[in-house]
Design a protein with these regions (language model features):
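A short SAM/SAH-binding and catalytic strip from SAM-dependent methyltransferases
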Residues: 155-168
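A short glycine-rich, Lys/Arg-flanked "PGG" loop and its adjoining helix->strand segment in the class I
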Residues: 171-183
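Surface-exposed loop/turn positions
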Residues: 89, 150-152, 185
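Class I (Rossmann-like) S-adenosyl-L-methionine-dependent methyltransferase catalytic domain
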Residues: 21-89, 94, 98-145, 167-172, ...
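A short acidic, Gly/Pro-enriched loop at the edge of an enzyme's catalytic core
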Residues: 144-156
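Acidic, low-complexity intrinsically disordered segments
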Residues: 1-24
Length: 265
């Protein structure tokens, strides 16, 4: 980009710097306009599941309506990619929060019947039930079991859940997902993997060294869900042994997180 600006400017470093500033300013203006248009669309849709700002902060670092809306559109598209528009049975949204993915899935008639959700955030579940009339959601605990019977679901998906569970507890949670899935059922999950551990802006040199040594890291962080779990691909493969076949593993497949498609054995 700098080379292109320099060729266009042709008037030395000062002109190049001016064009760079102009480009950055225009990018900011475009982002602001996109955010404004999105929020206007949200306001016009009376059926939109839009929780208050304090609940939106529970599921992300930013509380804007546009961010909540766009993240839900993105995550729901990935769910439909894996499970289709007409899932063959019940599908669990493990870590549903206040409905970021749910809103978009409810645009499909089959998903309105197939969807079930649970979260440790009792406030978010209460809001969905009382303010939105959605009864297919439950409060779950920070430790197994989930409030469902064995083999209840044909599918499970979760976004940014294992990323906030200490790595030494990942195996027991994979065992729990195995329990609630029917034989042959599939799961879509995201984790902070090797590429995330290499992010110098996210982790200190000492944290990165510890990750390199043991293949996992639990880092204390501020936020609604304190703590960030980072796990190597080898660590995750070990945690899945005897429970799931790995259909797909993508580095940074869900933004900065790795995403996995698993099949229950």
């Amino acid at each position: 980009m700098k080379d292109l600006i320099a060729r266009l400017g042709g008037k030395g470093p000062a002109e190049t710097a001016r064009l760079e500033r102009l480009t950055r300013d225009q990018a900011k203006q475009i982002a602001w306009l996109e955010k404004l248009v999105t929020e206007l669309l949200i306001e016009q849709r009376g059926d939109c599941l839009m929780p208050p700002a304090e609940l939106r902060m529970h599921v992300g670092a930013r509380s804007s309506k546009a961010n909540f809306w766009n993240q839900g559109r993105d995550s729901s598209a990935r769910v439909i990619e894996v499970f289709g528009e007409t899932p063959p049975g019940l599908v669990l949204d493990w870590g549903c929060g206040s409905g970021r993915t749910l809103y978009w899935l409810h645009g499909h008639e089959a998903w309105r019947k197939a969807y079930r959700g649970c979260d440790v955030d009792a406030e978010a579940i209460r809001w969905l039930r009382k303010r939105q009339g959605i009864t297919a959601v439950e409060v779950c605990q920070t430790e197994p079991p989930l409030p469902y019977g064995e083999g209840t679901f044909c599918g499970v998906f979760s976004f940014s859940v294992l990323t906030h569970i200490p790595p030494e507890r990942h195996r027991v949670w994979y065992e729990e997902l195995h329990r609630v899935l029917a034989p042959g059922g599939r799961a879509y999950v995201t984790v902070n993997g090797d590429s995330r551990a290499a992010d110098q802006a996210a982790f200190t040199a000492a944290e990165q060294a510890l990750f390199a040594e043991q293949g996992w890291l639990w880092a204390d962080r501020e936020g609604h869900y304190k703590g960030a779990a980072v796990v190597s691909r080898a660590f995750t493969a070990k945690a899945l042994e005897g429970l799931f076949e790995l259909e797909r593993y993508r580095d940074a497949g869900y933004h900065q997180q790795d995403d996995l498609i698993l099949r229950r054995v």
